[in-house]
């Protein structure tokens, strides 16, 4: 079972396993399962809905979200996946994705941490444009950024980005549409901007997408 770290890690950070590996606030646990039970096409054929849908199933833009249980600490942490609820809260409230506390902010903006671009054809890293980058990763605080770099293999060459205005751009998830037989078919995961009235009725969101603007 996870427990609160007592070293230099933030006080709210959970650890897991005999090596006491830090578990990010947004990380999904194996006890948190996604359920599509009750997902149907609306009677008028205009899009997706839940048979027992409640207001909390849609966000302020009317986009339907995948249902995921909240069970922090139950099972094993999946470092590759994020809890839909905690990711969304952290992205909206500018919370650190690792400890869940306030993310780091200076006059240059909020701190984001991401892997550097892969090497180019000649073996040299080709800089990617940062301005306008879409990300589902919430911001991070400075101590947790250092912690993440020490523990995450994909951050061997980290890129620290400051965004003065990380704008809520849309959502990440997938389209779910009926097949000729009436069965619902899932598409590959993709981004969808808010305001796409044609696509939104058939989209099932799992994460909030931020656009990093005014970056340094």
Positions of predicted regions on the chain:
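N-terminal alpha-helical interaction blocks
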Residues: 1-91, 163-216
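Long acidic/polar interaction regions in large eukaryotic complex-forming proteins
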Residues: 78-84, 91-95, 115-118, 123
């Amino acid at each position: 079972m996870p427990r609160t770290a007592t070293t230099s890690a933030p006080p709210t950070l959970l650890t897991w396993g005999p090596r006491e590996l830090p578990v990010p606030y947004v990380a999904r646990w194996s006890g948190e399962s996604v359920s599509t039970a009750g997902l149907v096409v609306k009677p008028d054929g205009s899009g997706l809905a839940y048979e027992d849908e409640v207001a909390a199933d849609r966000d302020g833009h009317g986009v339907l979200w995948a249902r995921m249980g909240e069970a922090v600490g139950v099972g094993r942490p999946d470092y590759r996946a994020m809890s839909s609820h905690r990711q969304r809260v952290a992205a909206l409230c500018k919370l650190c994705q690792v400890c869940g506390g306030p993310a780091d902010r200076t006059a240059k903006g909020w701190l984001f941490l991401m892997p550097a671009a892969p090497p180019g054809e000649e073996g040299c890293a080709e800089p990617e444009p940062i301005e306008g980058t879409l990300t589902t990763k919430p911001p991070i605080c400075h101590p947790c950024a250092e912690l993440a770099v020490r523990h995450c293999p994909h951050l061997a060459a980290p890129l620290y980005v400051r965004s003065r205005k990380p704008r809520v751009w849309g959502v990440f998830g997938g389209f779910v549409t009926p097949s000729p037989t009436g069965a619902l078919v899932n598409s590959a995961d993709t981004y969808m901007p808010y305001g796409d009235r044609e696509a939104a009725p058939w989209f099932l969101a799992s994460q909030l997408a931020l656009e990093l603007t005014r970056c340094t």
